[in-house]
Amino acid sequence: MAIVLIIIGIIIGAVVKGKDLIRSAEQKKLYNQFLSAWELAYVNYYERTGRILGDTNTPDNSGTRDGRCANDLTLANLEAQLRAVGLDPPAPGPTGSSATRRYSASNGTQYTLTISFRSRSDGTASNYNCIEILGMPTELGIAFDRIKDEEMDGTAGSFIAVSGNGGPRIAWPNVTTSQTVFAARLILGF
Protein backbone atom coordinates (compact mmCIF):
# COMPACT_ATOMS: atom_id res chain seq x y z
CA MET A 1 0.00 0.00 0.00
CA ALA A 2 2.81 2.43 0.87
CA ILE A 3 4.51 1.73 -2.45
CA VAL A 4 1.31 2.55 -4.33
CA LEU A 5 0.99 5.86 -2.46
CA ILE A 6 4.61 6.72 -3.25
CA ILE A 7 4.06 5.98 -6.93
CA ILE A 8 0.89 8.11 -6.97
CA GLY A 9 2.81 10.95 -5.29
CA ILE A 10 5.56 10.74 -7.91
CA ILE A 11 3.01 10.83 -10.74
CA ILE A 12 1.21 13.85 -9.25
CA GLY A 13 4.54 15.63 -8.78
CA ALA A 14 5.49 14.96 -12.40
CA VAL A 15 2.16 16.32 -13.65
CA VAL A 16 2.53 19.53 -11.62
CA LYS A 17 6.11 20.01 -12.82
CA GLY A 18 5.00 19.35 -16.39
CA LYS A 19 2.38 22.11 -16.17
CA ASP A 20 5.05 24.54 -14.92
CA LEU A 21 7.34 23.61 -17.83
CA ILE A 22 4.53 24.11 -20.35
CA ARG A 23 3.65 27.55 -18.87
CA SER A 24 7.32 28.57 -18.99
CA ALA A 25 7.56 27.49 -22.64
CA GLU A 26 4.40 29.49 -23.49
CA GLN A 27 5.85 32.59 -21.81
CA LYS A 28 9.16 32.27 -23.67
CA LYS A 29 7.34 31.79 -26.98
CA LEU A 30 5.24 34.91 -26.35
CA TYR A 31 8.36 36.88 -25.45
CA ASN A 32 10.20 35.79 -28.60
CA GLN A 33 7.31 36.19 -31.05
CA PHE A 34 5.95 39.43 -29.62
CA LEU A 35 8.21 41.64 -27.52
CA SER A 36 11.55 40.47 -28.91
CA ALA A 37 10.21 40.72 -32.47
CA TRP A 38 9.38 44.41 -31.96
CA GLU A 39 12.72 45.05 -30.25
CA LEU A 40 14.48 43.48 -33.25
CA ALA A 41 12.44 45.63 -35.66
CA TYR A 42 13.49 48.73 -33.68
CA VAL A 43 17.19 47.76 -33.78
CA ASN A 44 17.09 46.81 -37.48
CA TYR A 45 15.42 50.12 -38.34
CA TYR A 46 18.12 52.00 -36.45
CA GLU A 47 20.92 50.03 -38.11
CA ARG A 48 19.46 50.65 -41.55
CA THR A 49 18.62 54.35 -41.15
CA GLY A 50 20.54 55.71 -38.18
CA ARG A 51 17.18 56.94 -36.88
CA ILE A 52 14.81 55.94 -34.09
CA LEU A 53 11.72 53.97 -35.15
CA GLY A 54 8.74 56.10 -34.21
CA ASP A 55 10.77 59.31 -33.85
CA THR A 56 8.28 60.93 -36.20
CA ASN A 57 4.56 60.35 -36.39
CA THR A 58 4.52 60.55 -40.20
CA PRO A 59 4.32 57.22 -42.03
CA ASP A 60 6.70 58.31 -44.80
CA ASN A 61 9.59 58.93 -42.37
CA SER A 62 9.50 62.69 -42.94
CA GLY A 63 8.95 65.18 -40.17
CA THR A 64 10.95 66.65 -37.36
CA ARG A 65 13.09 64.23 -35.37
CA ASP A 66 14.37 64.68 -31.84
CA GLY A 67 15.66 61.19 -30.99
CA ARG A 68 12.58 60.30 -28.95
CA CYS A 69 9.66 58.09 -29.88
CA ALA A 70 6.56 60.15 -30.60
CA ASN A 71 3.88 59.30 -28.05
CA ASP A 72 0.99 59.54 -30.52
CA LEU A 73 2.14 56.79 -32.89
CA THR A 74 -0.26 54.34 -34.43
CA LEU A 75 0.48 50.77 -35.43
CA ALA A 76 -0.14 51.67 -39.07
CA ASN A 77 2.44 54.45 -38.73
CA LEU A 78 5.09 52.13 -37.27
CA GLU A 79 4.47 49.48 -39.92
CA ALA A 80 4.63 52.11 -42.69
CA GLN A 81 7.95 53.43 -41.35
CA LEU A 82 9.41 49.92 -41.39
CA ARG A 83 8.14 49.15 -44.89
CA ALA A 84 9.42 52.50 -46.21
CA VAL A 85 12.98 51.31 -45.58
CA GLY A 86 12.44 47.73 -46.76
CA LEU A 87 11.82 46.06 -43.39
CA ASP A 88 8.88 43.81 -42.59
CA PRO A 89 6.99 44.54 -39.38
CA PRO A 90 6.55 41.68 -36.91
CA ALA A 91 3.95 39.17 -38.00
CA PRO A 92 0.40 39.56 -36.73
CA GLY A 93 -0.56 37.08 -34.04
CA PRO A 94 -3.84 35.28 -33.38
CA THR A 95 -5.44 38.66 -32.55
CA GLY A 96 -4.87 39.79 -36.15
CA SER A 97 -2.53 42.56 -35.01
CA SER A 98 1.22 42.67 -34.55
CA ALA A 99 0.76 45.01 -31.56
CA THR A 100 -1.58 42.86 -29.45
CA ARG A 101 -1.47 39.36 -28.05
CA ARG A 102 -3.65 37.38 -25.70
CA TYR A 103 -2.31 35.55 -22.68
CA SER A 104 -4.06 33.09 -20.40
CA ALA A 105 -2.70 33.33 -16.85
CA SER A 106 -2.25 30.34 -14.60
CA ASN A 107 -5.52 31.20 -12.82
CA GLY A 108 -7.42 31.11 -16.15
CA THR A 109 -7.83 34.88 -16.52
CA GLN A 110 -7.47 36.11 -20.11
CA TYR A 111 -5.37 39.22 -20.74
CA THR A 112 -4.88 41.30 -23.87
CA LEU A 113 -1.36 42.73 -24.07
CA THR A 114 -0.87 45.87 -26.15
CA ILE A 115 2.50 47.37 -27.04
CA SER A 116 3.35 50.89 -28.09
CA PHE A 117 6.58 52.80 -28.58
CA ARG A 118 6.98 55.68 -26.15
CA SER A 119 9.38 58.23 -24.75
CA ARG A 120 9.05 58.06 -20.98
CA SER A 121 10.61 59.11 -17.72
CA ASP A 122 10.11 57.31 -14.43
CA GLY A 123 11.91 59.64 -12.06
CA THR A 124 15.18 57.66 -12.07
CA ALA A 125 16.66 58.83 -15.35
CA SER A 126 16.12 61.27 -18.15
CA ASN A 127 13.66 60.38 -20.88
CA TYR A 128 14.22 57.06 -22.56
CA ASN A 129 12.67 55.29 -25.51
CA CYS A 130 10.80 52.15 -24.62
CA ILE A 131 8.28 49.59 -25.70
CA GLU A 132 5.40 49.96 -23.26
CA ILE A 133 3.18 46.94 -22.63
CA LEU A 134 -0.27 47.60 -21.21
CA GLY A 135 -2.39 44.87 -19.66
CA MET A 136 0.64 43.00 -18.34
CA PRO A 137 -0.24 40.25 -15.87
CA THR A 138 2.18 40.12 -12.97
CA GLU A 139 3.21 36.49 -13.57
CA LEU A 140 4.07 37.23 -17.21
CA GLY A 141 5.93 40.43 -16.29
CA ILE A 142 8.06 38.48 -13.84
CA ALA A 143 8.79 35.86 -16.52
CA PHE A 144 9.72 38.50 -19.14
CA ASP A 145 11.93 40.31 -16.60
CA ARG A 146 13.72 37.04 -15.85
CA ILE A 147 14.17 36.31 -19.58
CA LYS A 148 15.49 39.80 -20.40
CA ASP A 149 17.42 40.79 -17.26
CA GLU A 150 18.01 37.45 -15.53
CA GLU A 151 16.39 38.93 -12.43
CA MET A 152 12.82 39.71 -11.48
CA ASP A 153 12.69 42.83 -9.38
CA GLY A 154 10.91 45.21 -11.78
CA THR A 155 13.09 48.17 -10.81
CA ALA A 156 16.45 47.42 -12.42
CA GLY A 157 17.70 46.42 -15.83
CA SER A 158 15.99 47.06 -19.14
CA PHE A 159 12.63 45.41 -18.33
CA ILE A 160 10.78 47.31 -15.62
CA ALA A 161 7.37 47.63 -13.99
CA VAL A 162 5.83 51.08 -13.46
CA SER A 163 2.97 52.22 -11.27
CA GLY A 164 1.38 54.66 -13.68
CA ASN A 165 1.81 56.88 -16.68
CA GLY A 166 5.18 58.43 -15.91
CA GLY A 167 5.11 56.77 -12.50
CA PRO A 168 8.12 55.40 -10.67
CA ARG A 169 9.61 51.97 -11.16
CA ILE A 170 8.12 49.41 -8.81
CA ALA A 171 8.97 45.91 -7.66
CA TRP A 172 6.76 43.23 -9.13
CA PRO A 173 3.80 42.75 -6.81
CA ASN A 174 2.93 39.41 -5.26
CA VAL A 175 1.14 37.33 -7.92
CA THR A 176 -1.43 36.06 -5.43
CA THR A 177 -2.53 39.55 -4.34
CA SER A 178 -2.06 41.65 -7.49
CA GLN A 179 -2.76 40.11 -10.86
CA THR A 180 -1.69 43.08 -13.04
CA VAL A 181 0.49 46.16 -12.99
CA PHE A 182 -0.24 49.42 -14.83
CA ALA A 183 2.44 48.79 -17.41
CA ALA A 184 5.74 47.14 -18.07
CA ARG A 185 8.45 48.74 -20.18
CA LEU A 186 11.32 47.40 -22.19
CA ILE A 187 13.86 50.22 -22.19
CA LEU A 188 15.52 50.50 -25.58
CA GLY A 189 19.23 51.21 -25.78
CA PHE A 190 18.91 54.33 -27.94
Predicted features and spans:
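N-terminal single-pass transmembrane signal-anchor helix
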Residues: 1-23
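Low-complexity, acidic interaction segments enriched in glycine
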Residues: 55-190
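Alpha-helix exit/C-cap motif
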Residues: 36-59, 87-88
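Secondary-structure transition/capping residues
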Residues: 29, 49, 53, 155-156
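Membrane-proximal amphipathic alpha-helices
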Residues: 23-35
